[in-house]
UniProtKB/Swiss-Prot annotation:
Gene Ontology terms: biological process: translation
Keywords: Ribonucleoprotein, Ribosomal protein
Signal peptide boundaries: none
Taxonomic lineage from the root: Archaea, Thermoproteota, Thermoprotei, Sulfolobales, Sulfolobaceae
GO molecular function: structural constituent of ribosome
Gene expressing this chain: rpl10e
SUPFAM superfamilies cross-referenced by the UniProt entry: Ribosomal protein L16p/L10e
Name of the featured protein: Large ribosomal subunit protein uL16
Similarity section: Belongs to the universal ribosomal protein uL16 family.
Organism: Saccharolobus islandicus (strain L.S.2.15 / Lassen #1) (Sulfolobus islandicus)
Length: 178
């Protein structure tokens, strides 16, 4: 069966389903790298993507956010060593689906609500508090607009509303005009 839309898994109720030692057949998360770029660089600004809603983000949405942010920053800044990107959320929660068929004769093949616990279909990261940080990008002053643009594009790949916050890592010097 095809993958359901992300809106089916955006909201949650109940505790997280994370005990992987008791769950057979969990697919691996699509997102594997959580840091990119140069972590030891000398940066001026930290740009953050912060959630303004509570919900779940599937692992394939996190991977889409990572790839589009990395691609945009690498293309606009010229190299992967001129920034540092860090994704802070990990998809621990296991998503289940009780597969239901909707075609002629499907009633002979499926069990309905009998044994309806569902099989694992993927994982998701839970956002349980407002204002949780999803992505941190550290850049120099000349690349600040590129980082904002990359996170704005990335926010469109997420099922939750977000905002962008810019934090200077050094005190801003005031230029004296004489």
């Amino acid at each position: 069966m095809p993958l359901r839309p992300g809106r089916c898994y955006r909201h949650f109720s109940g505790p997280a389903y994370t005990r992987k030692e008791y769950i057979p057949g969990i697919p691996q998360p699509k997102i594997t790298k959580f840091t990119s770029g140069n972590p030891n660089g000398d940066y001026d600004y930290e740009v953050r993507l912060i959630t303004t809603e509570i919900g779940q983000i599937r692992h394939n949405a996190l991977e889409a956010v990572r790839t589009i942010t990395l691609k945009t920053l690498t293309k606009r800044t010229g190299s992967e060593t001129s920034f540092f990107m860090w994704i802070l959320k990990y998809p621990h929660h296991v998503l289940r689906e009780n597969k239901m068929m909707a075609f002629a004769g499907a009633d002979r093949l499926q069990d309905g609500m009998r044994l309806s616990f569902g099989t694992p279909i993927g994982t998701a990261a839970r956002i349980e508090k407002l204002g949780e940080i999803l992505i941190v990008v550290k850049v120099k002053k000349e690349h600040l607009d590129f980082a904002k643009e990359a996170l704005k594009i990335a926010s469109k790949k997420l099922p939750l509303r977000t905002r962008i916050e810019i934090i200077p890592l050094r005190p801003i010097r005031q230029e004296v005009q004489s």
